[in-house]
Amino acid sequence: MQREEKQLDMLLEAVLNRLNDLKHSIGVMIHRLETEYETINWPTFLDNFALISSHLTGLMKILSTEIGTPLRNLTVLPLMLTPERDEALLQLTEGRVPIFSHDLAPDYLRTKPDPGAESRQAAHEAKANNLTVEASMKQVAQYNKVISHVWDIISKAKEDWENESSTRPGIQQTSSMADTQALVAAVGLGNGLTAPVGPPTGAGVMIPPAIRQGSPMSAVSPSGNAPMGKMPSGIKTNIKSANQVHPYR
């Protein structure tokens, strides 16, 4: 007797742990659907669904092993029924069951479908059993026709998408290699650059030595007066003539 009770406790503990994992996975999935419905993607949804499915499979596996006494041979009886609010029961069920009364006990402890749902299910099963072979084959043919039509639409859309993807050009080129090389040659070697030709400059405007006319350096200022108090420079200057080839020409 003690062995059977111990096995029953182990079975109930394993079932309870699996149910808690299942409840947590369902809660996480519902929370994501309520808060991340705009950003959740299909792979994430499938991962959550696969996790729930694995918990259900594990639960069914535990129940199918039937460690000790099968649960189907046991009977669950309520120890206390009251129409008043039970705070301990509310805390135990995490706020789901506040009252365990005579009216609610059959619904909570029911192991079979609701009588109304059971009657509707029986009516559907009877209707399916009374269906003739010809009618069933006709419905199957119509179903296959609809499936084929949907398949053709999807295949055509896939083919159009593949054709569009194959004919779509790659990344558009935003630069020209020839222009880049010409720019580098102009900056580094001066290719293609010419000196600007403009009107004669007036007095007092500084002219580059390479463009200035070849003449000996004059110590006379633009105003025509010789500089006063200027020390002679010991650095020799070499004024290039203007007819020399410009390095950027």
UniProtKB/Swiss-Prot annotation:
Keywords: Activator, Coiled coil, Nucleus, Transcription, Transcription regulation. Residues 215-249 are annotated as: Disordered. It is found in: Nucleus. Gene3D superfamilies: 1.20.58.1710. Its main location: nucleus. GO terms for biological process: regulation of transcription by RNA polymerase II. GO terms for cellular component: core mediator complex; mediator complex. GO terms for molecular function: RNA polymerase II cis-regulatory region sequence-specific DNA binding; transcription coregulator activity. InterPro entries: Mediatior_Med8_fun/met (IPR019364). Residues 1-26 form a coiled coil. It comes from the Eukaryota. Residues 215-224, 235-249 have a biased composition (Polar residues). Component of the Mediator complex, a coactivator involved in the regulated transcription of nearly all RNA polymerase II-dependent genes. Mediator functions as a bridge to convey information from gene-specific regulatory proteins to the basal RNA polymerase II transcription machinery. Mediator is recruited to promoters by direct interactions with regulatory proteins and serves as a scaffold for the assembly of a functional preinitiation complex with RNA polymerase II and the general transcription factors. Component of the Mediator complex. PANTHER family: MEDIATOR OF RNA POLYMERASE II TRANSCRIPTION SUBUNIT 8. Belongs to the Mediator complex subunit 8 family. This is Mediator of RNA polymerase II transcription subunit 8. The gene is MED8.
